[in-house]
Structure formats: C-alpha cells, structure tokens
Amino acid sequence: MAKGKDARIPVLLECTACVRNGVNKESTGISRYITQKNRHNTPNRLELLKFCPYCYKHTIHGEIKK
C-alpha cells in the first residue's frame, strides 16, 4: 500500500532566456525538459543549467506549472 502522496513528482523545466528574449528570430520555439524532483528534499522551484537548442548555449531552465 502507498503511504500518502508520492515524494517524487514530474516537473517541466523551461529555458528562461528564450522566454525573456521572446525567442530568437532565426528559430521559433522554447526549450523544455521533463524531469523529476523529490518534493520533500526540494520544496522550492527547481533551476538547472541545461542546453537550449534555440539559444545554442547552456542556460538556466526553471520549473514551470503544468
């Protein structure tokens, strides 16, 4: 039997540079990654450094609501 809510939840990470700059003129789109986080260990919003194929560099990807 499961004990209460699951600790691991899926989260979406979105490129903050693409959102701020309104996406590059050459390509349209916003980089998004799907990952998991442990709700008990990281109650705050998750931010990771990931590669953005639209910016062509590593940028900060922040957690967004579904």
From Swiss-Prot:
Transmembrane segments: none
InterPro entries attached to this UniProt entry: Ribosomal_bL33, Ribosomal_bL33_CS, Ribosomal_bL33_sf, Ribosomal_zn-bd
Species of origin: Helianthus annuus (Common sunflower)
HAMAP family: Ribosomal_bL33 (MF_00294)
Keywords, in A-Z order: Chloroplast, Plastid, Ribonucleoprotein, Ribosomal protein
Family: Belongs to the bacterial ribosomal protein bL33 family.
Entry's Gene Ontology cellular component terms: chloroplast; ribonucleoprotein complex; ribosome
MF-aspect GO terms: structural constituent of ribosome
Gene: rpl33
Family matches, as SUPFAM superfamilies: Zn-binding ribosomal proteins (SSF57829)
One GO biological process term: translation
Location in the cell: Plastid, Chloroplast
Pfam families, sorted: Ribosomal_L33 (PF00471)
Protein name: Large ribosomal subunit protein bL33c
Primary residence: plastid
